[in-house]
């Protein structure tokens, strides 16, 4: 679970990255699709070019990071705050919840690239814990 310190670190970092969140989301999603090609199955209607600069990846990256922003605002109740998104991914999109952890890995990587001075080991730990809790909350409707 997230401590008060973890929550404060995540909120402080989000304040810094929110303005670039769409760009970070596109980079994270694009990296995931290249590095973990099995995830492309969920985006087959987008064609073969799924790099970070393609319009579809840029748009969905922005959607993903908007959801992360919503999660930051709902940090004290992630399951409730992400309930509709969990339902969408479980019942309509049928996304394997293991992919949430893969995306979280790529989000962490991209944050560290864009904000190296802010991404201390302590912040890394808090963000990792937060994204693990977010992935768990998104998996709630799968049970």
From Swiss-Prot:
Keyword Metal-binding: yes
InterPro entries on file: Globin, Globin-like_sf, Globin/Proto, Hemoglobin_a-typ, Hemoglobin_oxygen_transport
Residues that coordinate or bind O2: 60
Domain Globin: 1-143
Keywords: Acetylation, Heme, Iron, Metal-binding, Oxygen transport, Transport
Entry GO MF terms: haptoglobin binding; heme binding; metal ion binding; organic acid binding; oxygen binding; oxygen carrier activity; peroxidase activity
One CC-aspect GO term: hemoglobin complex
GO BP terms in the entry: hydrogen peroxide catabolic process
Tissue expression per record: Red blood cells.
Residues given in the record as heme b binding sites: 89
Function: Involved in oxygen transport from gills to the various peripheral tissues.
PANTHER family referenced in this protein's UniProt entry, alphabetically: ALPHA GLOBIN-LIKE-RELATED, HEMOGLOBIN FAMILY MEMBER
Subunit structure, interactors included: Heterotetramer of two alpha chains and two beta chains.
Protein family according to the UniProt entry: Belongs to the globin family.
The protein's name in its UniProt record: Hemoglobin subunit alpha
UniProt gene name: hba
């Amino acid at each position: 679970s997230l401590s008060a310190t973890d929550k404060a670190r995540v909120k402080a970092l989000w304040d810094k990255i929110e303005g670039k969140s769409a760009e970070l989301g596109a980079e994270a999603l694009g990296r995931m699709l290249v590095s973990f090609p099995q995830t492309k199955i969920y985006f087959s209607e987008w064609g073969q070019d799924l790099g970070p600069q393609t319009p579809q990846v840029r748009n969905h990256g922005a959607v993903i990071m908007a959801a992360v922003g919503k999660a930051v605002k709902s940090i004290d109740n992630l399951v409730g705050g992400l309930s509709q998104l969990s339902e969408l991914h479980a019942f309509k999109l049928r996304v394997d919840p293991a992919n949430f952890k893969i995306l979280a890995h790529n989000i962490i990587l991209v944050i560290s690239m864009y904000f190296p001075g802010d991404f201390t080991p302590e912040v890394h730990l808090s963000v990792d814990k937060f994204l693990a809790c977010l992935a768990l909350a998104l998996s709630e409707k799968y049970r």
